[in-house]
């Protein structure tokens, strides 16, 4: 297993448009839409206008409801929702694209989102922003951003150990990597869960794996964060097929946030074990 459709998006994109694609992703929360808009527009002004015309807001489950206290209950999907998507590092420019920031930007009105992105990340002057967007209360827009999770750090050994525990389907070991207030969510399922105990009960109840070897985790690079394409063994033919794409937020306390994306368009049709 050596990649996914997620990485194919980077391969199909013009590398000279990396900055514009990253800008459009920060506006839209979708790598697919970002590539489309960047291909059709030569300037940041034109691309920003099209992003505003699309006026999409892509949420995560944490934006729609409170945490669930029933990790063993039935999971409900909302496939009609346009969910936030991860972003391949191969497309990223030098500015921030971490998922917590993108999710926070998606909660803002689109014009305020554009103003914050253009000023803080693209270094546009207030006059240039006003010429494009009209008057915007930039300090007020910036103040509306929710506080982000604890400071992210690079912990490759933790990510590797987490991968090994998942491939062994060792749930107690998996849970040792999560911070006490960790969040687990998995669009398009609307429920989300807080704390290692609930996360463990969720995995034990709903994960199709039965033992070691049922899951294979392929490391990816997404949103400048550790990520894994998870392939699950199909017991009918022993082929590992696309199951979910996990993006992790790591802090000194451990994994503070895990998002498991079940959008299978991010994967090839199947992978042989």
Protein language model regions, located:
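A short, charge-rich alpha-helical start-of-domain segment used by transcription regulators
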Residues: 1-22, 30-35
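C-terminal and inter-domain tail/linker signature
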Residues: 7, 11, 29, 63-75, ...
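Σ70-family region 2.3-2.4 aromatic/basic alpha-helix that recognizes the −10 promoter
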Residues: 17, 39-73
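Short, small-hydrophobic-rich alpha-helical interface motif
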Residues: 20, 24, 34-47, 129, ...
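Short alpha-helical functional segments enriched in proximate histidine and acidic residues
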Residues: 23, 27, 50, 54, ...
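Acidic active-site catalytic centers that drive phospho-/nucleotidyl reactions
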Residues: 33-36, 53, 120, 170
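Active-site micro-motifs of SAM-dependent methyltransferase domains
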Residues: 49, 53, 123, 184
């Amino acid at each position: 297993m050596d990649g996914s459709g997620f990485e194919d998006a980077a391969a199909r994109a013009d590398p000279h448009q990396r900055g514009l694609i990253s800008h459009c992703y920060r506006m839209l929360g979708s790598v697919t839409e970002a590539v489309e808009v960047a291909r059709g527009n030569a300037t940041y002004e034109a691309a920003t206008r099209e992003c505003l015309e699309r006026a999409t807001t892509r949420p995560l489950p944490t934006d729609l409801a409170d945490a669930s206290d029933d990790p063993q209950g039935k999971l409900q999907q909302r496939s009609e929702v346009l969910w936030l998507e991860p972003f391949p590092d191969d497309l990223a420019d030098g500015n921030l694209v971490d998922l917590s920031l993108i999710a926070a930007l998606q909660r803002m009105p689109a014009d305020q989102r554009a103003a914050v992105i253009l000023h803080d990340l693209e270094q546009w002057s207030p006059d240039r922003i006003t010429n494009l967007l009209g008057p915007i209360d930039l300090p007020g827009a910036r103040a509306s951003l929710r506080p982000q999770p604890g400071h992210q750090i690079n912990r490759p050994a933790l990510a590797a150990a987490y991968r090994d525990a998942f491939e062994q389907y060792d749930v107690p070991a998996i849970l040792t990597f999560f911070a006490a207030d960790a969040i687990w969510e998995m669009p398009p399922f609307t429920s989300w869960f807080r704390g290692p105990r609930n996360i463990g009960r969720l995995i034990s109840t709903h994960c199709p794996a039965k033992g070691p070897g049922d899951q294979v985790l392929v490391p990816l690079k997404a949103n400048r964060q550790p990520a894994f394409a998870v392939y699950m063994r199909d017991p009918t033919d022993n082929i590992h097929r696309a199951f979910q794409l996990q993006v992790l937020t790591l802090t000194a306390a451990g994994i503070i946030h895990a998002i498991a994306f079940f959008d299978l368009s991010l994967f090839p049709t199947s992978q042989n074990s």
